């Protein structure tokens, strides 16, 4: 399957930038923050509320309308565990709030290498616990490394009646051993070396790559997991692990042809990203 023409144009433009592997942590974070422009103009929402959970964990809540009964989507940004913040995914969280008619809680979880595993996973569970304490319907979502945290939080809260989980090209297998790691190692946006770097920075030396707290794909029991929708990109290093996890959840992942890792956060320039946003909203709306 050839690349989507808009995706191909994006990749051609990216050749003007330094390769990701040449960037230090600070530059990596700034690059993702600047990439928020690819989402398009941030839409207005009824309210934006900055929060601090448990005295340290920054979060931001988006309200589509002023209604305390609105369901709440806890969203974890991507960035390979080493980048991303409240600003990098601000437009996407606003769009999800409006499209799915729900409040969105964006979580500014701690990043590696300053804070290594299980810091981010602990932050994710804390954020979901806070959300569940609000007495409203709660779901979890995330892209890439954020989908890892969403999946892990869903596993940790089996008995909490989470409405659903939305996993966008999840980074959930630290073994980095699926065929898509070879097939799309280079030339398709973030590649195999970039993903492996994220895992190296995140996992302390000696961590078992199959530890389900780090790699939810290897969780022993998924039978009580909340309903899931897994989105994958055809030309993505992470494609195969996401689709394998979907099969374990008893569903088929929705693969978007001709797309690459990160496409979901580019609705400002990619028609297929706008389609995926609409599909994600439809899934969420069906579970409120």
Question: How should each PLM-predicted stretch be described?
Answer:
Residues 85-86, 92, 100, 105-137, ...:
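Catalytic nucleophile-loop/oxyanion-hole region of alpha/beta-hydrolase
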Residues 268-288:
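Catalytic active-site module of serine/aspartate enzymes centered on a nucleophile-bearing elbow/loop
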Residues 69-79:
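Short beta-strand element of the alpha/beta-hydrolase
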Residues 206-259:
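Serine-hydrolase catalytic core
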Residues 59-69, 217-222:
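Short beta-strand-to-loop junctions in surface cap/lid or active-site-entrance loops
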Residues 1-64, 288:
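A glycine/proline-hinged amphipathic helix-loop "lid/cap" segment
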Residues 155, 159-207:
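Hydrolase active-site cap/lid region
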Residues 142, 146, 150:
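Gly/Ala-rich beta-loop-alpha elbow adjacent to hydrolase catalytic centers
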